[in-house]
Regions:
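C-terminal output helix
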Residues: 105-115
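Charged docking surfaces used in two-component/phosphorelay signaling
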Residues: 15-23
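Active-site residues of response regulator receiver
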Residues: 52, 82
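Conserved acidic carboxylate
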Residues: 8, 32
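Residues at the ends of beta-strands that form strand-to-helix hinge/output surfaces
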Residues: 86, 103-104
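The feature encodes the CheY-like receiver
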Residues: 56, 74, 86
């Protein structure tokens, strides 16, 4: 079961996304700011990080840069999540080290299509029959 870390300061967004991903079969961890996201990534080594870019204290841009500079976590894919869909934001996220980018409000189908580039789809695996 792929382990997903959601780094999101908005409680409603965090809870809704974590519930929806758990229903899809993912193991979900949550962090509420960039510092906690870095610490949890280093400790738990998730398969994927969903990183809000607008976080208090340490924003998602800097948290991602730090994760990508750390030899223990640089291999972990990060998908940037942002409500700021301004021209150039996707490029800025990729430059910060994000592997993919998605905008809020999140559409689960669109997000899942991006996630499966990096982690297995637990529902697809559950539907497979053993050989």
């Amino acid at each position: 079961m792929p382990k997903i870390l959601i780094v999101e300061d908005n409680e409603l967004s965090r809870d809704m996304l974590s519930r929806r991903l758990r229903r899809k079969g993912y193991e979900v961890l949550v962090a509420t700011d960039g510092q906690e996201g870095i610490a949890m990534t280093q400790r738990e080594l998730p398969d994927l990080v969903l990183m809000d870019l607008s976080l208090p204290d340490l924003d998602g841009w800097e948290a991602t840069r730090r994760l990508k500079k750390d030899a223990r976590t640089q291999h972990i894919p990060v998908i940037a999540l942002t409500a700021h869909a301004m021209s150039g934001d996707r490029e800025k996220a990729i430059d910060a080290g994000c592997d993919e980018y998605d905008t809020k409000p999140l559409e689960l189908r669109r997000l899942l299509s991006k996630m499966v580039r990096f982690v297995e789809d637990p529902e697809a695996k559950a539907g497979e029959t053993p050989a």
